[in-house]
Amino acid sequence: MTALDTLRGKYIEAISSAADEAALEEVRLAALGKKGEISLKMRELGQMSPEERQTTGAALNRLRDEIDASLRARKQGLADAALDARLKTEWLDVTLPGRPRRAGTIHPVSQVMAELTAIFADMGFAVAEGPQVESDWFNFDALNIPPEHPARQEHDTFFMARAEGDDRPPHVLRTHTSPVQIRAMQAQGAPIRVIAPGRVYRMDMDQTHTPMFHQVEGLAIDRDISMANLKWVLEEFCRAFFEVPSVELRFRASHFPFTEPSAEVDIRCSWEGGQLRIGEGDGWLEILGSGMVHPKVLAAAGVNPDEWQGFAFGMGIDRIAMLKYGIPDLRAFFESDLRWLRHYGFAALDMPDLAGGLSR
């Protein structure tokens, strides 16, 4: 047996006997470290003759590779043994439920927009959209709102500044979605049935008002449309939206520049234990404004008022969401509070439809 065979047997035995990774590291350093026995013998090759160097060098390389492979194998074996020992001391109850993954929710405003879109689509209304930054003409003039009207003052409307020297009327952040109706009539003519949901802007801020809120307005133009048609549409909408078998509406004479005659609409309701009940009781709650489209508005949109007539209505989406789902403060709609959204939000896959139920 040569000296290298003796060295090999010594370290193979030491590797096999190493009880943990620390002991195995000591063996590695003793054999292959900078001052290890095999490393020192590799340095002695320079003092040998060429023939001895070739023979001994090859043998040392084989020994080094074998020891290194044995060290790696033993290290993996120790790691596997440690894992087995740890697993034997641990246990997992596979019957435990999994951790729920936090899912997002649909905002009440988005939900209500989808609900009212489904209801009016069932009555033949299409959805129309328009810009949120409007010209003075579309937002006011075309809707028969005179220059002296309070809504055209700076304390009520957000005006967009023009460049210095530009004397044209300023653009505004639209104060209602009625300009969309003008654009729809200009583009499609008559007859037409559209609703226009979207964001609107007014200078107001309290528990029931915010500078930005959501509104939906409806428009129907045909040759024989009357207030009776308006009443039926609004009753059907309220019955479907509030998910009650019947509703009673009260029309109160009012004044809006863009409709004539005009009416504010109240719905019969009651309050029981702080909860609003629609369709019963002795109370009345205002929910929207409506009326027959003013002939000047039809003419401004390019529709002949001698041939066509129609009705229009408008309501606050945030307001009817508050009424239906018992939300006390309008400002919370825009605060991005995750706790609030999880409480009042809706499951992403619960898309409202009349057959399956608007809210589930």
Swiss-Prot record:
A single GO BP annotation from the record?
phenylalanyl-tRNA aminoacylation
Q: Could you give the cofactor binding note from the entry?
A: Binds 2 magnesium ions per tetramer.
Query: According to the UniProt entry, what is the EC number of this protein?
Result: 6.1.1.20
Q: Which reaction does it catalyse?
A: tRNA(Phe) + L-phenylalanine + ATP = L-phenylalanyl-tRNA(Phe) + AMP + diphosphate + H(+)
Write down any Gene Ontology CC term. cytoplasm
Q: Please list the GO terms describing molecular function.
A: ATP binding; magnesium ion binding; phenylalanine-tRNA ligase activity; tRNA binding
Q: What is an example of a Pfam family matching this protein?
A: tRNA-synt_2d
**Which sites bind Mg(2+)?**
E260
Question: Which cofactors must be present for this protein to function?
Answer: Mg(2+)
Q: What highest taxon heads this organism's lineage?
A: Bacteria
Q: Mind telling me which InterPro entries this protein's record contains?
A: aa-tRNA-synth_II, aa-tRNA-synth_II/BPL/LPL, Phe-tRNA-synth_IIc_asu, Phe-tRNA_ligase_II_N, Phe_tRNA_ligase_alpha1_bac, Phenylalanyl-tRNA_Synthase, tRNA-bd_arm
Leading EC class = ligase
Where does the protein end up?
Cytoplasm
Which SUPFAM superfamilies does the record associate with it? Class II aaRS and biotin synthetases, tRNA-binding arm
Query: Record keywords: Ligase included?
Result: yes
How the protein assembles, per its UniProt entry?
Tetramer of two alpha and two beta subunits.
What is the protein name stated in its UniProt record? Phenylalanine--tRNA ligase alpha subunit
